[in-house]
């Protein structure tokens, strides 16, 4: 079986999407967004909060902070 390499951002976003972890996203212009990732692709992230969706382009994102620890890989301790 050929193992395909995954980008760290894809692993991170897919993990927080599956676990429905709330995120705080800071944009390069200083705007702070919060919500849950419902989908993402190479160029954007779909964020949902209070029944509203926001499409955020990745080039506008500065920092992503999860609301709780994220275990992205098997065997990773939560220390």
UniProtKB/Swiss-Prot annotation:
GO molecular function, one term: RNA binding
Superkingdom classification of source: Bacteria
Alphabetical list of InterPro entries matching this protein: Hfq, LSM_dom_sf, Sm
Keywords: RNA-binding, Stress response
One cellular-component annotation, GO: cytosol
Example of a GO biological process term: regulation of translation, ncRNA-mediated
S-S pairs: none
Signal peptide: none
Domain Sm: 10-70
Subunit structure: Homohexamer.
Purpose: RNA chaperone that binds small regulatory RNA (sRNAs) and mRNAs to facilitate mRNA translational regulation in response to envelope stress, environmental stress and changes in metabolite concentrations. Also binds with high specificity to tRNAs.
Family classification: Belongs to the Hfq family.
Protein name per the record: RNA-binding protein Hfq
Organism for this UniProt entry: Bartonella henselae (strain ATCC 49882 / DSM 28221 / CCUG 30454 / Houston 1) (Rochalimaea henselae)
Lineage start: Bacteria, Pseudomonadati, Pseudomonadota, Alphaproteobacteria, Hyphomicrobiales
Gene name of this polypeptide: hfq
